[in-house]
């Protein structure tokens, strides 16, 4: 009997939620949200990040001023231990999710590789 792919996806969702890095990420995010200075800085960083992404998606040039502002925010972020921990944990979780994505996409990769070799 074939498993329903959506059921497997929900199992994966549950496994991610139970992952130690995800639990640490939730704790780190709560710590950032509980500290007004960290929260404000994190919100500023996210706003800047989204603005730069939007500019890139619209084909707009990222100016020297944009780069300078981003660098200044990054320097301040690196000085905030709570945000640094949050970002490091998020990066570890992103690696896990990237690995899972490679596994999920393997059948398509093999299909297209076989097509090119034929």
UniProtKB/Swiss-Prot annotation:
InterPro entries xref list: Com_YlbF, YheA/YmcA-like_dom_sf
Family per similarity comment: Belongs to the UPF0342 family.
Protein name in the entry: UPF0342 protein BALH_0781
Native source organism of the sequence: Bacillus thuringiensis (strain Al Hakam)
Pfam families tied to this protein: Com_YlbF
């Amino acid at each position: 009997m074939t498993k329903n792919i959506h059921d497997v996806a929900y199992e994966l969702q549950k496994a991610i939620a139970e992952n130690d890095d995800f639990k640490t990420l939730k704790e780190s995010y709560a710590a950032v949200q509980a500290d007004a200075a960290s929260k404000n800085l994190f919100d500023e960083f996210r706003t800047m990040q989204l603005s730069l992404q939007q500019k890139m998606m619209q084909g707009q040039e990222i100016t020297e001023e944009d780069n300078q502002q981003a660098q200044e925010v990054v320097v301040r972020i690196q000085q905030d231990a709570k945000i640094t921990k949050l970002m490091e944990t998020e990066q570890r979780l992103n690696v896990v999710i990237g690995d899972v994505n490679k596994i999920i996409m393997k059948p398509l990769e093999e299909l297209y590789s076989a097509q090119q070799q034929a």
